[in-house]
Amino acid sequence: MLPVRSARNWLTLRNSWLLLRNAGRRSFYSTKPKAPRKDELPSFTKIALVGVVGTIIFAEAVKSLDKNQPKNSYSESEYAEVVKNMKRRKVMFSPGELKVQIAVQGVNPGNFHDRGRIVEPFEVAETYRKMDNDRYQPLLNDLRDTYGDQYVQNLPQGLLVMLIGRYLKDTCQKGDSVLVVDFPLDMSDAIKFENEISVVDKVLFNSPEADSDLAKYYQTVNKVEIL
């Protein structure tokens, strides 16, 4: 006689085998097996599909994140390409298209001879302030009402650079020489002008301003002329 535990295990195995055999017979002898509805896929198929779709979505999300990640390091060639693309996208005048010189505030107008067409910031601002329906006319009028003839010194940061660039584009032709006087007003304008408008060939300073931060900035690229 089998022990009780062994007998129970044997009965369990036997019953399981009989159930599987009977289930197989019912499936084999059924003449019209019930087809699953098209919208009722087997659970394992659903799981597989969810897995595939989830993987695709995740992969695309990773790609998206990868594209939007800020790049913190560049090789020398990559950096050169970035700078090249920035210049192609932003600079209004390509190098050599205009010969641009600048005379900071305080330079004697007697030094302006034979340096090309004179461009004054006040003249530039007045051109667009008096232009009907210009998008900057209301702002320039408000500033003129508030500050009078000194309103050019009180323009929003960067606006004077943009207006001068626009004025040069509207009035100059390729190969022209221009001297922008009483400019830049600060270091920010100096950097913005060369980054977005044009490379500067020379910057004129009086002797007292030779040690200014602005002069030192232009000295790093050998563009300073002391008068």
Swiss-Prot record:
It is a single-pass membrane protein. The chain crosses the membrane at residues 41-57. Residues 1-35 form a transit peptide. Its main location: mitochondrion. Keywords: Membrane, Mitochondrion, Transit peptide, Transmembrane, Transmembrane helix. It is found in: Mitochondrion membrane. The keyword Plastid does not apply. One of its GO terms (cellular component) is mitochondrial membrane. Belongs to the AIM36 family. This is Altered inheritance of mitochondria protein 36, mitochondrial. It comes from Lachancea thermotolerans (strain ATCC 56472 / CBS 6340 / NRRL Y-8284) (Yeast).
